[in-house]
Amino acid sequence: MRRLSVTIGLLYESVKNHDIKLIAGEKGLSKAVKWVHMVENIEIATFLEGGEVTFSTGIGLSNEFELINLIEGIIKSKASGIVINIGLYIKKIGKKCIDYCNETNTPLFVVLWHVHMAEIMRVFCIKITENEKNSLEISTSIQNAIFYHEREDLYLSQLEIHGFKSENKYCIAVFDVNKFDMINDEKYIIRLNECIENYLSVYYKQAVCVRINNQLIFLFMNTTESKVLEILQKIVKHCESKHLIKSIFIGIGKETKSIRCIYKSYGQADSVVIINRKKYNNDICRYDDIGIYKLLFAIQDRNVIRSFIDETIGKVIEYDSYNNTDYFTVLRCYLSYNGSLQDTANELYIHRNTVNYKIKKSEEILNVDLSKLEIREMIDIAYKLHDIL
């Protein structure tokens, strides 16, 4: 399976015959690379956006102290790696520079002066460009397999080329990012996507992560649902350590028998996300965890759903809208606690008598008797249908 990101380690492998040597930061070889940049002074380092491999000849640097400052500035700008030309302006790399790159897991390479550094940059740029092309092809093909599954010509052969064999088993998981976070920080989801893909490239190569609108969609190959859950839990923990987890809703679909069926797994994962978003539940849930919702999602006619809601809890919704009351919320909480006034009061931080009054009022508005089990069940289903609209 081809990765969606190119790492500094892969780039290094492609130019080992150019007399380039890694002298520090070996643990950072898994870092993703976006592009290359010549950086000869600390001022230029401030223009870095993160993810670059920087190249320096040392021109303009008069001592080791200035070199250390330059390296620190490059690393603070979140570059993925540093290549330094030694021989003419920089005679050698001192211990302080090496130690700092090891501490920050920033790969530091040296190239002798007789080596044409421009050729290394050219190879890097070609590899990065090729990877971007492959990433776009994979992302587009996965999107087509999900949303235009009947058009196999739009995705089957393309995914095969990139290592996604059609008869392998696949499972889709969805990270749905809060739209408010998207509007206020578009770069957030980009950083999150990069962080996840970087993690997968190191720890789990049987999965890719692509972005479609405000969702990050994971495609796992030959991976059970329980294993997917375990991997996602580790990814969330990793992203939390990078302060990249905000309001994210996560769902896992069922494993499919073919790439042709990943649209089903996506639909299931997306259904879980809808429920999690409605309940503001940030836990990772599988499709099999949502119980009766699986049956309710199978109802295709939205008009039937709306009619049922209107006939059961519609009057409470309308009453709350006109009177700025909260009977809808209180009634649902009451049903979730199997009709316990005290548990409902504890959950909502209100007095038991207040709950009793509001439940009686709800019965009056709906013209029902909530002491009857079938009535409570019917209203509970209406609430669940309300969740999926």
Language model features: what each stretch is:
Residues 1-75:
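Gly/Thr-rich phosphate-binding loop signature of adenosyl cofactor/nucleotide-binding cores
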Residues 72, 98-99:
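Alpha-helical segments flanking ligand/cofactor-binding loops in enzyme cores
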